[in-house]
Curated annotation (Swiss-Prot):
Record flagged with keyword Transit peptide: no
Location, primary (coarse class): secreted
Residues annotated as signal peptide: 1-21
Keyword Signal recorded: yes
Keywords, in A-Z order: Immunity, Innate immunity, Secreted, Signal
Record function comment: A humoral factor that may play a role in stress tolerance.
Species of the source: Drosophila simulans
Top-level taxonomic group: Eukaryota
Family that this chain belongs to: Belongs to the Turandot family.
Protein name per the record: Protein Turandot B
InterPro entries: Turandot (IPR010825)
Example GO BP: innate immune response
Lineage: Eukaryota, Metazoa, Ecdysozoa, Arthropoda, Hexapoda
Subcellular location: Secreted
GO CC annotations, alphabetized: extracellular space
Length: 139
């Protein structure tokens, strides 16, 4: 009986891992989305509003990154999101949430710099996964 239980648990673990894997198709879709976000985010408010979408894409891709890549980006995100103030008060609801309220000019500058650097980091990772020749053939 123990063998059957262990086998069932192992099968469920294996199936769960395979179903939740970050597929090549999802990577390509996210790669195109990051490129679109970076290309179409021209003003500060748009950049600030799209930070959460970049963080969502990063959270999807993070488990498939090398440990050093993940640690580098996690440190960058933590360094910039923990200190973001909204109306002079630290943001609530988690370290990785950016509220869509009016920010002071200094905070807006920090947030847009964060957007630019995070977007560039994600784009760089996608470029390393999909060299230009592969990406160009898929378009």
């Amino acid at each position: 009986m123990n063998f059957k239980t262990a086998l069932i648990c192992f099968a469920l673990l294996l199936i769960g891992t395979l179903c939740s894997a970050y597929s090549n198709q999802e990577r390509q879709r996210d790669s195109r989305r990051v490129a679109e976000i970076m290309r179409t985010s021209l003003d500060d408010n748009t950049k600030i509003h799209r930070i959460q979408e970049l963080l969502t894409i990063y959270n999807r891709m993070a488990p498939s990154l090398r440990p050093d890549e993940r640690a580098r980006i996690d440190r960058f995100i933590s360094r910039h999101t923990e200190g973001i103030m909204v109306d002079g008060v630290p943001s609530q609801g988690g370290a990785r949430k950016i509220f869509k309220k009016t920010l002071s000019p200094a905070a807006k500058s920090v947030a847009t710099g964060f957007f630019t650097e995070l977007g560039a980091s994600l784009a760089s990772l996608f470029t390393s996964w999909f060299p230009a020749t592969t990406t160009e053939r898929n378009h």
